[in-house]
Amino acid sequence: MANNMKSATFCKATWAIFLVALAILVQLKGSEAQAGGCASQLGNLNVCAPYVVPGAVNTNPSQECCAALSGVNHDCMCNTLRVASQLPSSCNLAALNCGN
C-alpha cells in the first residue's frame, strides 16, 4: 500500500513538473506555436510551480496561481495533457501508468 502511494505521488509529481516545464517552454516558444492562445494560457501557469513540486511545504495555491489556472481553456488543458501523455511512447519509453 505504501509503495502504491509513493508511486502515485511520484507519478503525479512527475506530471506536475512536466506540465510546469511545458508551460515555461510554451511561453518561451509561444510566438512559434500554432495555437498561440493556448500557449499563452499555459505559459501563465509557471506561477503554480511552487505548489506542484514533491515535498512542497505549501500546497495551497496562491490567488495568482488560481487565477492563472482559471484562465486556461478546458480544451487547451485537455489537449496538452493528451499530447503530453503520448510523449513517452514517441520516445520509445514505457507508457506512464499513474494509477488513481
UniProtKB/Swiss-Prot annotation:
SMART domains: AAI (SM00499)
Top-level lineage group: Eukaryota
Record keyword Secreted present: yes
Primary location group: secreted
Keywords, sorted A to Z: Disulfide bond, Secreted, Signal
GO cellular component: extracellular region
InterPro entries, alphabetized: Bifun_inhib/LTP/seed_sf, Bifunc_inhib/LTP/seed_store
Disulfide bonds: C38-C76, C48-C65, C66-C91, C78-C98
Signal sequence, renumbered to the chain: 1-33
Residue ranges the record marks as coiled coil: none
Location within or outside the cell: Secreted
Family: Belongs to the A9/FIL1 family.
Protein name: Protein MEN-8
Organism encoding this protein: Silene latifolia
Species classification: Eukaryota, Viridiplantae, Streptophyta, Embryophyta, Tracheophyta
